[in-house]
Amino acid sequence: MTRYVPPQEALSLVRSGMRVFVQTAAAAPQRLIAAMVERASELRGVEIVHMHTEGSAAYVDPQHRDSFHASVMFVGHNMRDAVNDGRADYIPVFLSEVPRLFRKGILPLDVALLHVSPPDRHGFCSLGISVDVGRAASDCARILIAQVNPNMPRTHGDGLIHVSRLTAMVECNDPLLEALPKPLSALERSIGRHVAGLVEDGATLQMGIGAIPDAVLAALGSHRRLGIHTEMFSDGVIDLVERGIITGECKKVHPGAIVAGFAVGSRRLYDFMDDNPMIKMLDIAYVNDTDVIRRNPQVTAINSALE
């Protein structure tokens, strides 16, 4: 039976030259990351692999250049300087293709650092708000180190992992990282109203993160029977669900359900997701598969872009 151990003991499983996966976005396991970075002087050539992550990424600090090198599929705020300085590499790849890199051994993983809910009475933990590529990583990595946190929502879908699969567990009661909704400007609200006018009743929405997708969601109050099939989602969907605007009833794939790979938002969002059968957190290879997406009606993608 897998047992709980201190972070330092769990991260002693990481050796020089290993490839280590870090879970995505707000599920990035900060205690495990900190314990790994504490061992920087003992390690050389550890490759860190991840998508977008929130929070600290101290392994790419200049003083750890010989110990760690990051290979990232998304360049977020905590990776930009490192990529520009050569302490991290950007791997251009569609997110839907990343699970295949793990499963086919193209990018084999030695260790996966995960952030999960406590096990249920059957021994299953949940990847919670970040299933996306974490499902494939947890299937393929030789060593799974899990930060077990009662604040992690237990979500329905592909994110269940039995404790027998975990190599080491670390207890944690830290608040999850949050991305709080920001007040929208008059211009953003105007853009949101314009885009919302292009969305048809019964449409299936995909939306990104940022002010414009948030502004569009805020302007959908008069719509009906909307559905969600999206890589990620945030707080903007909650009110629309509670007001009966997002129902998913017109969707052909998982009708009635919100389908996503990961979520980033406030504590309110995480509580909304907890044990909510309406929300299906699924493997991103499936969520972002165009053959799946096109089966839904009136698919409408809402994202931000740089001019």
Regions found by a protein language model. Give the residues of each.
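Conserved alpha/beta enzyme-core scaffold
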Residues: 1-307
